[in-house]
């Protein structure tokens, strides 16, 4: 677990060597390089993880309790959102900002060290990962566990298929569909179907999509 590994690094006396006097928390908030094993960061993070544990321990019929917990956990969350447990998150959703009517299937992983914005009416398949955290390529900094975060923006009415991965700094436009298993490494425009590793635009959403919902099956409602 990342938090436990950072705790060990902290105990070993490995620090980021920052000389400007800014706290790790301030550097984290500003998207700069920082040491995630900082004691103050870990203390705040642990409080978030306790709420996440409570969420994942709810019984199937405790939907009202889950809704209440999400309001405590997330940076903000709109109405009628549903996230199937288990939910995995570095900060328990503290840096997640979600609109209305969002559905996420089980095993959603939110690496929310940085901000994640998810628009209204989004659907997220099982085993999707949305990550904001990265590490420098430079070996010396990585050896010290140094990290940086880049926000992810997902527009409204986006469908992300099962097993997709969205990496730090990516924006996905409104109404787009991300195919199952895709790895989204760059921005995806609005109103397109995009698939693959790396994820690329396959086509625009068009007239045929308004006539057929699957292959030759016509929309009848």
Sequence positions of predicted segments:
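Flexible, glycine/small-residue-enriched loop-and-beta-strand segment within the central core
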Residues: 60, 85-171, 197-199, 203-215
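Short hydrophobic beta-strand element within catalytic cores of glycosyltransferases
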Residues: 184-185
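Short conserved AdoMet
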Residues: 78, 155, 189
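Terminal amphipathic alpha-helical/low-complexity segments used for targeting or macromolecular assembly
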Residues: 1-80, 199-221
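Short alpha-helix at the nucleotide-sugar/activated-sugar donor binding site of glycosyltransferases
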Residues: 123, 176-177
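Short-chain dehydrogenase/reductase
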Residues: 159, 177, 193-195
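Conserved catalytic segment of ABC-fold P-loop ATPases
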Residues: 173-176, 189-191
């Amino acid at each position: 677990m990342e938090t436990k590994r950072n705790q060990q690094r902290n105990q070993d006396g490995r620090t980021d060597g920052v000389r400007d006097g800014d706290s790790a928390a301030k550097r984290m908030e500003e998207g700069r390089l920082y040491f995630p094993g900082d004691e103050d960061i870990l203390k705040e993070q642990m409080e978030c993880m306790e709420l996440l544990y409570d969420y994942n321990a709810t019984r199937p019929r405790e939907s009202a309790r889950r809704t209440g917990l999400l309001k405590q956990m997330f940076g903000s969350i709109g109405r009628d959102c549903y996230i199937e447990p288990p939910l995995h998150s570095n900060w328990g959703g503290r840096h997640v900002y979600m609109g209305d009517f969002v559905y996420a299937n089980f095993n959603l992983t939110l690496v929310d060290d940085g901000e994640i914005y998810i628009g209204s009416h989004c659907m997220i398949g099982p085993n999707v990962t949305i990550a904001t955290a990265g590490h420098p390529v430079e070996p010396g900094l990585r050896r010290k566990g140094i990290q940086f975060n880049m926000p992810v923006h997902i527009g409204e009415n986006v469908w992300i298929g099962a097993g997709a991965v969205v990496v730090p700094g990516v924006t996905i436009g409104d109404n787009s569909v991300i195919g199952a298993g895709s790895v989204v490494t760059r921005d995806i425009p609005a109103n397109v179907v995009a698939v693959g590793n790396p994820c690329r635009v396959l086509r625009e959403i068009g007239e045929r999509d308004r006539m057929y919902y699957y292959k030759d099956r016509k929309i009848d409602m």
